[in-house]
Amino acid sequence: MLDEIYKNQKAFSDKALEVLKRDFTTLRTGKVNINIVDHINVDYYGSPTALNQVATVLATDASTISISPWEKTMLKAISSAIQAANIGVNPNNDGDSVKLFFPPMTTEDRQKNAKEARSMGEKAKVAIRNIRKDANDDIKKIEKDKSVSEDEIKKGYDEVQKITDSYISKIDQLVKDKEAELLKV
């Protein structure tokens, strides 16, 4: 019974780490990352569609993203969607593709993104702590049933805390690494 609780706690905690890593891809570093446009939806024949479903998105160099739609009629809709997404650049429509030129990041931009990374890390820690609470609640249910000895219950609480501490330290390391990447000139 307790092993199942640990397994669930680890599975949910792994998902929380994956969400944090995915969120980190939306933060701009010194070089462009095509994931910065992943959340943008384009009006495709009346329905919102992910940008990467209607166009090829490539990083042509360290400061430029090129978006080549599969249908040239989508150029205007893509430009509008990018402007509406407010990602800090204006789209440049050259008739065949939309280019996004990212200016060099200022120290202020880097510090702002590092602060955002810390905030994302804190949200992930809250998620891990909520997962711990759920695991502890499950152990309390087993404790009420008296189907497991008190020593096993104590070990259960200790193991849940060890798992939580492990994931919190992983999050701290991810945030530290991301901050270093963001602040590197």
Curated annotation (Swiss-Prot):
Record organism: Campylobacter fetus subsp. fetus (strain 82-40)
Pfam families on file: RRF
Identification of the protein by name: Ribosome-recycling factor
Lineage, broadest ranks: Bacteria, Pseudomonadati, Campylobacterota, Epsilonproteobacteria, Campylobacterales
Annotated keywords: Cytoplasm, Protein biosynthesis
Family the UniProt entry places it in: Belongs to the RRF family.
Subcellular locations according to the entry: Cytoplasm
Molecular-function GO terms, alphabetical: ribosomal large subunit binding
Cited NCBIfam families: frr
PANTHER family named in the record: MITOCHONDRIAL RIBOSOME RECYCLING FACTOR PSEUDO 1, RIBOSOME RECYCLING FACTOR
Keyword Protein transport found: no
Physiological role: Responsible for the release of ribosomes from messenger RNA at the termination of protein biosynthesis. May increase the efficiency of translation by recycling ribosomes from one round of translation to another.
